[in-house]
């Protein structure tokens, strides 16, 4: 008996939508739907269809109805059926899809061939084997409670490993109970200003633009503090009477590259003590110093006045969403209260893997390898500039994964356009300047040297030198 069978649609196969509607018997409707799915390309050639029983259960049909529909489509050549391989879409069942000829676009700059943007590590150097080994060990050793709800601070194994590592390598004074694991620097900043701290916040006049966007989204007003070759001009903080928090990159000021002078480190801590304020220490590029030992963390001068924030986004990969905050005692509970309400916790397996990776010494070995690799990259950049553009000065090259190339006044925008035509993705210095900064504007390029693959790095440097203004 014919019937109108509508408002019925289900999923079959590999997430392909099968629409069962229209007049006719259930067998006829199913045959038509399968034929249309093959004809339109929804069911690709050689796709294996579900067994009769499974599809019948999914669609609320009799098994014989599905079997008859399959048999009919096999006879028509839409499907094939073989013992042991099930029922599949015939390889020549569907007509070829029409090829769309794109309209010719107007001539423009080429797509970037070389990525020289800052802030990105060498993805090809991720220690896959060592990370996999650490993950297997960590998973085998994980206690049952690791697969439960967990501690909002993060796994104790990782917090203990971080406390030991940070004390040894960065001079951080802490214990595991004052470390809160999060999923990176940006989530840490959201937590702190999502209900724990209030603005206005002093920031460096040149800094990461996404920090400012994130803070603006949280309705936090930022006040710029000048920077020079020695980091932030901390003496300017006293002029901002309402400011109770300052965000700094003391290990390697971003983007200018200068480490904060020892006397300025002491000065900012004295300011925080006198005003009852806090220093947020972004340990940007703290692991990658080439010409001498990495400078110690400001947090070591006063753990009750400094929030130390770090992550593995540069040392390992931004794909591993792990970071940490080392908090003063009085902030631990407020941060945990906000974290429990607002932020998804970092993955337990990644936490356990990183703990093993640190404890086994694999993290130290990886960092030593990467320091040498990035030092070599830096040296090739400075050598290319010395040979082909000696009038261009590179600054901030003692640490980190980028350099600032100082350009003649008024040439930044034209150089960026030339770089685009050379197939380069690179940032201008103006992008990182605070809108209310009062320090003089400077023209420059912020050139990352961590990302290009080895085989293409020479070509990237050639393209960069061609884009620079003549001397």
Place the predicted regions along the sequence by residue.
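Flexible, Gly/Pro-enriched loop and linker segments at secondary-structure and domain junctions
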Residues: 305, 426-428
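Short, polar loop motifs at secondary-structure junctions
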Residues: 206-210, 430-435
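Residue-level detector of anion-binding/catalytic polar loops
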Residues: 221, 278, 424-425
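Conserved core of the PLP fold type I
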Residues: 135, 145-275, 287-289, 293-301, ...
């Amino acid at each position: 008996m014919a019937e109108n069978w509508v408002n019925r649609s289900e999923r079959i196969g590999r997430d392909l939508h099968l629409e069962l509607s229209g007049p006719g018997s259930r067998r006829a409707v199913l045959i038509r739907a399968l034929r249309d799915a093959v004809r339109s390309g929804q069911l690709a050639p050689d796709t294996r269809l579900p067994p009769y029983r499974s599809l019948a259960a999914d669609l609320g049909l009799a098994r014989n109805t599905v079997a008859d529909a399959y048999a009919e489509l096999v006879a028509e050549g839409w499907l094939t059926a073989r013992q042991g391989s099930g029922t599949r879409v015939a390889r020549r069942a569907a007509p070829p899809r029409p090829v769309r000829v794109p309209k010719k676009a107007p001539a423009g700059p080429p797509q970037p061939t070389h990525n020289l943007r800052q802030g990105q590590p060498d993805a090809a150097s991720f220690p896959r084997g060592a990370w996999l080994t650490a993950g297997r060990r960590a998973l085998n050793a994980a206690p049952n409670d690791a697969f439960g709800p967990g501690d909002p601070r993060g796994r104790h194994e990782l917090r203990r490993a971080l406390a030991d590592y940070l004390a040894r390598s960065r001079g951080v004074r802490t214990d595991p109970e004052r470390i809160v694991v999060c999923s990176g620097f940006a989530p840490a900043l959201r937590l702190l200003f999502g209900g724990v701290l209030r603005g206005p916040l002093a920031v460096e006049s040149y800094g990461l633009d996404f920090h400012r966007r994130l803070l603006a989204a949280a309705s936090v007003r930022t006040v710029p503090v000048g920077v020079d070759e020695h980091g932030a001009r901390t003496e300017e903080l006293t002029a901002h009477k309402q400011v109770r928090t300052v965000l700094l990159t003391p290990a390697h000021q971003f983007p200018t590259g200068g480490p904060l002078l020892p006397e300025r480190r002491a000065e900012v801590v004295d300011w925080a003590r006198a005003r009852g304020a806090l220093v947020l220490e972004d340990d940007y590029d703290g692991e990658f110093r080439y010409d001498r030992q990495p400078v110690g963390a400001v947090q070591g001068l006063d753990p009750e006045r400094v929030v130390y924030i770090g992550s593995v986004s540069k040392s390992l990969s931004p794909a591993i969403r792990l970071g940490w905050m080392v908090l003063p005692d009085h902030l631990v509970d407020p941060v945990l209260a906000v974290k429990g309400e607002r932020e998804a916790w970092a993955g337990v397996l990644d936490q356990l893997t990183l703990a093993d990776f640190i404890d086994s010494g694999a993290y130290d070995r990886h960092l030593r390898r990467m320091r040498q690799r990035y030092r070599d990259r830096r040296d090739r950049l400075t050598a290319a500039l010395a040979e082909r553009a000696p009038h261009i000065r590179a600054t901030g090259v003692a640490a980190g994964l980028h350099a600032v190339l100082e350009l003649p006044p008024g040439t930044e925008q034209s150089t960026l356009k030339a770089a685009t035509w050379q197939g380069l993705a690179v940032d201008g210095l103006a992008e990182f300047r605070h809108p209310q900064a009062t320090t003089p504007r400077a023209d420059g390029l912020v050139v990352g040297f961590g990302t290009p693959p080895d085989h293409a790095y020479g070509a990237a440097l050639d393209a960069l030198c061609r884009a620079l203004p003549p001397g």
